[in-house]
Amino acid sequence: MLFDYYCDLNLKNITSVKYRHLFLLLFWPVYLTLFVLTEKYVTPIYNVYSPMDDFIPFCELFVIPYVLWYAFLAFVSIYTLFFDIPSFKKFYTFLCVTSVITFAIYILFPNMQNLRPDTFVRDNILVDVMKNLYEVDTNTNVCPSIHVVFSIGMLFTLWNSKHFSSALWRTVSVVITISICLATVFLKQHSVIDIFAGVGLSVAIFPFVFLKEKNKCKKM
């Protein structure tokens, strides 16, 4: 059953080995606090831009995978929490480490981008959604892209989970991840530099989180 593993969870045993992974969920209030503080108090200095950005048109269709990121994040978090706790631990360790590095970059290298269109060629519901996103999600603290980093973290998690080892699941996860990464530049939320930075950070942290246990087994 879905909740069998947590059926005897209470305040007295929440710190036990069986349940202490739940404290990783404290990542979210800490993350959101850092997000709000950096948005409010960090003044951007460096403009992130690449000539490649000029060749990428705005395309509102990418709102779909961009918003899908939130559902993808919720799915991986909830599924691993209940059905694959080792993967949950790795995923949230990845989120914690990469977020600390990302926010440190935002503070030490306060950045922004000026890629958003002033006007929109088309007028439809997807453009309206994007206008609302622009109001909520500012054009500051963009490099590296958290959308990209978290998406790749989800991809690593699924690919390293026995529950998602089929070719179908792996293909779907790759397609979703690539679509989300492309959405960040086609919606003018990020520069291509932000993608490269996000990929670089994710790949650099990958072996320390996802290959740690495998390397220990080989040594034994």
Which functions belong to the PLM regions below?
Residues E39-M52, L81-F164:
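Membrane-interface loops
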Residues V63, Y70-L73, C96, V100, ...:
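Residues within membrane-spanning alpha-helices of integral membrane proteins
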Residues Y19-F27, K89-V97, L168-S173, I193:
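Alpha-helical transmembrane segments of integral membrane proteins
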Residues L32-L34, S99-L108, V175-F186:
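Aromatic-anchored segments of alpha-helical transmembrane domains
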Residues M1-A74, D118-V121, M130:
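N-terminal transmembrane-helix/juxtamembrane module of multi-pass inner/ER membrane proteins
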Residues K131-M220:
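Membrane-embedded catalytic cores of phosphoryl/pyrophosphoryl-handling enzymes
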Residues L26, V30, L34, T93, ...:
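Hydrophobic faces of alpha-helical transmembrane segments in multi-pass integral membrane proteins
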Residues K12-R20, F55-C59, F82, P86-S87, ...:
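Membrane-helix interfacial "entry" motifs
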